[in-house]
Swiss-Prot record:
It comes from Histophilus somni (strain 2336). GO terms for cellular component: cytoplasm; plasma membrane. It is a peripheral membrane protein. Keywords: Cell inner membrane, Cell membrane, Cytoplasm, Membrane. PANTHER family: HIGH FREQUENCY LYSOGENIZATION PROTEIN HFLD. The keyword Cell membrane applies. The keyword Coiled coil does not apply. This is High frequency lysogenization protein HflD homolog. NCBIfam families: PRK00218.1-2 (NF001246), PRK00218.1-4 (NF001248).
Amino acid sequence: MANYQDITFALAGVCQAAKLVQQLAMNGTVDQEILRTGLSTLLQTAPEDTLAVYGGQKSNLKLGLETLMEQLNGSDVTLNRYWLGLLALEGKLHKNAQAKSELARRIQYLPTQLAHYDLLDEQMLSTLASIYVDVISPLGARIQVQGSPLYLQQLMTQNRIRACLLTGIRSAVLWRQVGGTKWQFLFSRRKLVATAQQIYSSI
C-alpha cells in the first residue's frame, strides 16, 4: 500500500523546486534558505527516512506544500509544466543506466567541493548547473523556462535555475522510490490533497 505521506513529501520537494525556478525566472531572486534546503537534498544519498532528505523538518517544505496544493487544483499552467516536466525527465533518467551512473558519480564529488565552498557560493551553483546540463539535459524533454529576459540572460540566474531543476530531479527520484506514480494524479488526487493539507496544518 502506498505511503501517501512520503509520496507527498517528495512531490512537495518537486513542486518547491519548480516554484523556485519560476521565481528566479520572473524576479531573479528567491529565499536563500529555501534554496539551501533544496540544494542540500543533493547531499542526502543515504537518508534515514523521506523527511530526512529535507533536513527532517516539515517546515522546510512549506513553500512546496503550498505549491502542490495549488497545482493539484490546477491554478498555474506554467508551473504545472515545470513540475510535470521534472517528473517526465526523471522517468527518462530512470531508464538510462549510463546517465544514472554518471549522475551518481558527479554527486559523489560534491562533499569534496563543499570543503572549500559554501553550498550557495557561485562556484557550487555553477558546478550543480553543469551537472544538470551534462547529465539531465541530453535525456530530452527539455524544460522551457519562461520569465524576464533581464534575468534569464544572466549567467548567475541560469546557474541557479539549473541547480534548482537538479534538486527537482532529486525529489522526483525520491518520489519514484517511495511509490509515487502518475496514476495517483488521476485516481488518488483527493488523497494527495488531503495528505498535503494535513502535513501543512501540522507545521
